[in-house]
Every structure is written in structure tokens, then in C-alpha cells.
């Protein structure tokens, strides 16, 4: 979510907004490009947060655009598929906080507690950003916990020891 969403949120809150786009079409990171005759889709393939209570759903409702969207649900058992080439393994990533944690706990039983605590940490950290919950900022918007400020690899290492699982979670960190 980028400039258009930000502009819409500012406008919804009474600001006069002008959104500028440097490319020929609006969409920021959702553009495609062609190199050597091959077309590359660079945009997202899936967007979470649209289930009831989800942060993106609440934001779209707040902006008054939810009813205009054509949302197709993802497969509950495999919202995404990760291929870990170093080991030749495939990981089907299920929908939902608990199922996400359970799926990795099943594949990495020695890390079950760490995975659950890591997922809880991600949700705790997202709670520090008032925008995700559509609430007013409390105190300075630039004041966050020590854990919030950690690089992703250090945060993951606090909870997970297995290097393979740390690789997988680090890859997925910006997405989930």
C-alpha cells in the first residue's frame, strides 16, 4: 500500500491531497516492465488482511471503497507456496495466524515454541503501528519498543535457532 492509499487516508481526514506518479500509469510498485521482449509482473500476487477484522479490510471500509473491490479469497490451506531450493523442500503456507505457526511447528518440532513466540511478536509489533488498527497514535509515532527497531534477522534469531527456518522466516518477513 503506497501513495494512493496514503493520499486517500489523508483526504478522508480532511487534508487536500495531490498524488503524483512518475510512471505513465498509476500504481507504483504494481507496474509491469518489459526487458528483451519479456514482460515482468512486479506487483503483488496476494494481499492479506481482507478477512473480517483484517487491517486492510478495515482501512478499505474506512475509506468507503470496500464495496467497490472484487476480492477473491485465497486457499485456506495454501495462501502461498515457498520452495526452499537449498533443500528441495516446498512449504504450503496456510491462512491465519495460528495455522501459520502450527504449520512451521509441525515441520520444525524443536522450534515449535519459538515459532509461536515469533508470530506473537510480529502481531505485538504490528500493534505498535496505530494505522494497522485504525486508531489514533498514542504518544510519539516515532517511539517504538526496542524489539520493533531490530533488523529482521536479529528479531527472528531471538526466537528461532534453526538456520533453515530462520532463512524461510526472513524471506517471508516483509510479506506476512
What positions do the PLM features span?
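Rossmann-like flavin
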Residues: 86-176
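N-terminal glycine-rich phosphate/pyrophosphate-binding loop and immediately adjacent elements
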Residues: 1-121
Amino acid at each position: 500500500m503506497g501513495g494512493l492509499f496514503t493520499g486517500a487516508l489523508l483526504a478522508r481526514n480532511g487534508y487536500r491531497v495531490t498524488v503524483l506518479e512518475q510512471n505513465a500509469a498509476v500504481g507504483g510498485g504494481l507496474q509491469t516492465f518489459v526487458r528483451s521482449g519479456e514482460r515482468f509482473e512486479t506487483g503483488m500476487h496476494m494481499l492479506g488482511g481482507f478477512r473480517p477484522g483484517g487491517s486492510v479490510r478495515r482501512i478499505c471500509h474506512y475509506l468507503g471503497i470496500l464495496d467497490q473491490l472484487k476480492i477473491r479469497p485465497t486457499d485456506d490451506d495454501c495462501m502461498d507456496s515457498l520452495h526452499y531450493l537449498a533443500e528441495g523442500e516446498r512449504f504450503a503456507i496456510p491462512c491465519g495466524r495460528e495455522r501459520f505457526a502450527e504449520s512451521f511447528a509441525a515441520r520444525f518440532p524443536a522450534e515449535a515454541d519459538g515459532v509461536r513466540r515469533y508470530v506473537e511478536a510480529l502481531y505485538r509489533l504490528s500493534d505498535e503501528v496505530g494505522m494497522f488498527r485504525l486508531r489514533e497514535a498514542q504518544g510519539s509515532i516515532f517511539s517504538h519498543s526496542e524489539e520493533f527497531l531490530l533488523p529482521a534477522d536479529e528479531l527472528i534469531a531471538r526466537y528461532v535457532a534453526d538456520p533453515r527456518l530462520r532463512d524461510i522466516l526472513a524471506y517471508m518477513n516483509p510479506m506476512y
